[in-house]
Amino acid sequence: MPSATSHSGSGSKSSGPPPPSGSSGSEAAAGAAAPASQHPATGTGAVQTEAMKQILGVIDKKLRNLEKKKGKLDDYQERMNKGERLNQDQLDAVSKYQEVTNNLEFAKELQRSFMALSQDIQKTIKKTARREQLMREEAEQKRLKTVLELQYVLDKLGDDDVRTDLKQGLSGVPILSEEELSLLDEFYKLVDPERDMSLRLNEQYEHASIHLWDLLEGKEKPVCGTTYKALKEIVERVFQSNYFDSTHNHQNGLCEEEEAASAPTVEDQVAEAEPEPAEEYTEQSEVESTEYVNRQFMAETQFSSGEKEQVDEWTVETVEVVNSLQQQPQAASPSVPEPHSLTPVAQSDPLVRRQRVQDLMAQMQGPYNFIQDSMLDFENQTLDPAIVSAQPMNPTQNMDMPQLVCPQVHSESRLAQSNQVPVQPEATQVPLVSSTSEGYTASQPLYQPSHATEQRPQKEPMDQIQATISLNTDQTTASSSLPAASQPQVFQAGTSKPLHSSGINVNAAPFQSMQTVFNMNAPVPPANEPETLKQQSQYQATYNQSFSSQPHQVEQTELQQDQLQTVVGTYHGSQDQPHQVPGNHQQPPQQNTGFPRSSQPYYNSRGVSRGGSRGARGLMNGYRGPANGFRGGYDGYRPSFSNTPNSGYSQSQFTAPRDYSGYQRDGYQQNFKRGSGQSGPRGAPRGRGGPPRPNRGMPQMNTQQVN
């Protein structure tokens, strides 16, 4: 019985809790239904969110209580299973264990349902808020558009034509009356007031914005003798009339006619303006063609402005030279050809003259400038008689292009001038030798530059710059008719040679013309330039030159080689004992060689030093004297110079003759071949066939004739 009673008691007790739980579940459902029913009424997402949070909080609290109760019942059940005795209350609680478990499961399921519902509500709230935001933006945009339209209409109402059209209407029905137009004018003064400096701009337009807002809202507030609602209806009537949707011309057709009449005028102006670009293009093409014709990549106007003075100066000098050539006596010799007179076409046609000068300048850019720079600077140079010994040119190297052959100049008219003697610019110039040199001597047929266009502006006339040409004995018949190629200041371009050649061709015309003033037998100056200047200033103090004029020109039809050859003096002693060597300086005959080699018995036993200039190799191989060991120099050899007969040039003896120690006057060549024999560490003397000398002192030299 007690057990039954307890069981029944427990059963009765267990049957008791479900109603509270059921009541709690119904309350929760009612609470959930209440917000659901209140959702459409409230319409605010914040209230819905707050209610959902409260419902979820109540459910969580019920779940915690049921879990605690279930935990106690589990403990009681375990104690009963162990055989312990429980009191009546504990036994009643154990009897309600199944009810508590069912309520707990129901609460959990309800919590899950409310959680899902809360999420759906949150999504709905977000969507609603977004929709409301869009609707609000659309409403604001619509309001702003209405405000802009209202301002436009109020501005256009100030036009009399618009006011008349609105009074008359488009189809005869008036849109606005005069009273309504007056109301709109008064309202325009409120929404667009004149600037009142007593108020701030923000305050002044704040009042205007209130009037606009009330008009858009259509409030019943009085304004301008009426209300905002009435004004809003008037404005909406104007908008619905669509009067301002189309453009209206109020010039009664005059504006359209003027536009139609002005259109052909504009077209005519465009048609007249079209040929102008064509003319400009034609002018540009002419300028470009001028650039190609001149071959100087300059326009003709630029060229004429830049080169006019120089061309005029060349023309004047050309005329002077031609006149001086024509005035010379031309009956000196029967073999003298008649000079070609320069036709003065260049004066009558400046364009042809300038083109001819350009063509010649283009052909003579390279070697022409070099020869002019090296050959025409005669004013500041000193005359060195040891250098003035002309070598003949090869007369076969003539230019095929037409040249002006100058007549043979009378010796009396030419030799009377003291500045007509060609001078070697520097002793350090590279000497050149002719391939057909035999025994040459100076003769006096003098030649002037032939081509006038190749002259450069100088301080003195070009006819004063002359060169003495040595003639060969077997060329006496053509001695007076040599072409102008022998002039050092005239450039002759061979047709078979390129204008700009990197190598040096000794047979070319410019270098053949250089042979008239370069001497192969000239002593090479020392490598030290201060010594050269010192020596030069020392001997120039006692140097004098004189010129003798002859009444008639002496023709040298045949010159014998035996009359001109002299025996080179010997060299004896040391530096303290100078010896004078008389005689002319003559090139030994060489045949069939471009650069002949002659024996040089006065060199020392050592080979030629390397690395030095060609003209200074003889100096590098000077003797080392027994006294002071000086190597090379000018202070041992003192020659006296005698001039060739009938040369028109005489020279007094040196009062302080020059000394050239350890140096040979004649027979020195710069382009000798090196010897093949070996003698000691340095080998045989390079370029000389003799055996090496055992001694390095000052040897005793014997007289030897150079052939």
Swiss-Prot record:
GO terms for molecular function: ATP binding; molecular condensate scaffold activity; molecular function activator activity; mRNA binding; RNA binding; signaling adaptor activity. The modification Phosphoserine is found at residues 10, 113, 333, 341. GO terms for cellular component: cell leading edge; cytoplasmic stress granule; cytosol; dendrite; lamellipodium; P-body; synapse. Highest expression in thymus, spleen and brain (at protein level). Lower levels in kidney, muscle and liver (at protein level). It comes from the Eukaryota. Residues 58-92, 123-151 form a coiled coil. The modification N-acetylproline is found at residue 2. One of its GO terms (biological process) is synapse assembly. Tyrosine phosphorylation by EPHA4 promotes interaction with FMR1 and liquid-liquid phase separation (LLPS) for the formation of a membraneless compartment that concentrates mRNAs with associated regulatory factors. O-glycosylated (O-GlcNAcylated), in a cell cycle-dependent manner. O-glycosylation by OGT inhibit ability to undergo liquid-liquid phase separation (LLPS). Residues 1-48, 325-347, 412-496, 526-558, 570-707 are annotated as: Disordered. The keyword Cytoplasm applies. The modification Asymmetric dimethylarginine is found at residue 696. Its main location: cytoplasm. Residues 1-15, 22-43, 325-335, 475-489, 674-684, 695-707 have a biased composition (Low complexity). Keywords: Acetylation, ATP-binding, Cell projection, Coiled coil, Cytoplasm, Differentiation, Glycoprotein, Methylation, Nucleotide-binding, Phosphoprotein, Protein synthesis inhibitor, RNA-binding. Residues 431-452, 465-474, 533-552, 572-603, 640-655 have a biased composition (Polar residues). Residues 453-462 have a biased composition (Basic and acidic residues). Glycans are attached at residues 642, 647. The modification Omega-N-methylarginine is found at residues 163, 624, 631, 638, 696. It is found in: Cytoplasm, Cytoplasmic ribonucleoprotein granule; Cytoplasm, Cytosol; Cell projection, Dendrite; Cell projection, Lamellipodium. The C-terminal disordered region undergoes liquid-liquid phase separation (LLPS) for the formation of a membraneless compartment that concentrates mRNAs with associated regulatory factors. CAPRIN1 molecules in the condensed phase are neutral. mRNA-binding promotes phase separation. Moderate concentrations of ATP enhance phase separation by reducing the electrostatic potential of CAPRIN1, thereby promoting intermolecular interactions. May form homomultimers. Interacts with G3BP1; interaction is direct and promotes stress granule formation. Interacts with G3BP2; interaction is direct and promotes stress granule formation. Interacts with PQBP1. Interacts with DDX3X. Interacts (when phosphorylated by EPHA4) with FMR1; interaction with FMR1 promotes formation of a membraneless compartment. This is Caprin-1. It comes from Mus musculus (Mouse). The lineage of its organism: Eukaryota, Metazoa, Chordata, Craniata, Vertebrata.
